Amino acid sequence: MPARAIAGVPDLMHHKYVVRDGETVWTGSMNWTDDSFTRQENVVAIVRSAPIAARFEENFAELWHTGAVELTGRVPPNPVRVGDRKVRAWFTPGYGEALSTRIAKAIARARRRVRICSPVITAAPVLSILAQVVSEGELDLAGCVDQPQVHGVIHQWRQNGNVAWKLPLLERVMTGDFAGKRSEPWRPGGGLHNFMHAKLTVADDLVFLGSYNLSRSGERNAENVLELDDPQLADQLAAYVDGVRSRYPRFEFDKVTG
């Protein structure tokens, strides 16, 4: 089978998807590694829809023919009916900023619940609205992050004045009901990769899941997200988030040094 490497500098080819026979898509947050299957939290979706499969095939063709992350993700996120559900396939970097704004608006419109799993939260639209929601204290908001990865972000922001303005927002968000998995910090020489790796947002009955962290870098990487309007699935995945966060202690912001 032909294969092609996509340069990951400066932005990552971060997709994890398969299209089978132009009819079915397998996608989500899980890399194809032993640790991903056995040591990490991940979410995977299977969508049986030729129109959705066509969107992913178009995105694959962008990567295959250009070999350049920055020239991809330009497939429009037009809605598709899959049974009685409305589904959108989002791709970045072409629609990266639009995706962050879309998720932020869904959170802002939520009236019953918001559940989040994301290793980090750094995308400005999402960070801003979450800080507002936590401050208002009226919405059932909870989630889980990867504590060492968020601590790494905090350390970087403290060293870089250009993004230090985000620190009060992140600190405010993490005073909410967020757990932090104490994973093994990433090391260049390898080791255990047991990160909290799921990328999932539930806002009332709307679900966003895929390869995209809620991050500024994610807006620029080659990523994909499924947006699904499905009350039953939203209930299932909100319960999944609650299960994940119940396994770990609350996030601790004040233990960051540097």
Predicted regions and their residues:
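PLD/PLD-like phosphodiesterase catalytic module centered on the HKD motif
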Residues: 1-26, 30, 34-41, 46-65, ...
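Proline-centered turn/helix-capping motifs that create local helix->coil transitions or kinks
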Residues: 64-72
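Long, charged amphipathic helices and adjacent flexible linkers at domain junctions
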Residues: 71-80
